Amino acid sequence: MSTGTPSETAKAQASASANAPSFESIGIKNKDIVQKSGVSLSDQQKVLVGSVLDLFEGNPTLKHLSLWSKTATFQDNITIAEGYDKFAAQWYGLPALFDPIRIQSHTVTSAGNPIEFKLKNTYTVKGVKSEQTMESTVQIEVGADGKIAKVSDKWDNELPEGAFSQALRKLNAVTVPTLVKVPKTEEEDQKMKAEREKRTQ
């Protein structure tokens, strides 16, 4: 019979939700999550979507990647990056090759597992100033621990030839983890973030 005292499980859940990642604790920029009529994300799902939108906009940080399982996978039409070293290199490689990256629109179409949203993103290839807008369907699979297990980016259209596709293929090469600098410490991460933000001002 219940005595009115919270069970250990309830206490653990309350403690977990108190310590749950938030827009503020992760430093998420994309806080205004657009949901299709009838779709209702939980606060935790909104944090995951906002963090992934930040990554697609070229704003990776170690805190953003702390929301991912170490064994997670990132997949798009031309690459599969399995494990932390590979998917971290993908996200840190994006702003190294494209600047600026601007999200034109996004709409969450499913609050299930996977969470699904439509994304329209404009990439400008660094140095070449070649601009390309891509539309895709993004799925975020969440593991039992609440961390991201997989992100799939399925493009609606074929990859156009030219500077954009060359840059993307470079990003998706197997050599990326050895070429792209992924910060090891919070201090290093903050320094890289400050340099990125200085460029976009």
Task: Please place each PLM-identified region on the residue numbering.
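Terminal "cap-and-tail" regions of soluble proteins that handle hydrophobic small molecules
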Residues: 2-58, 143-201
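Generic short beta-strand segments
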Residues: 118-124
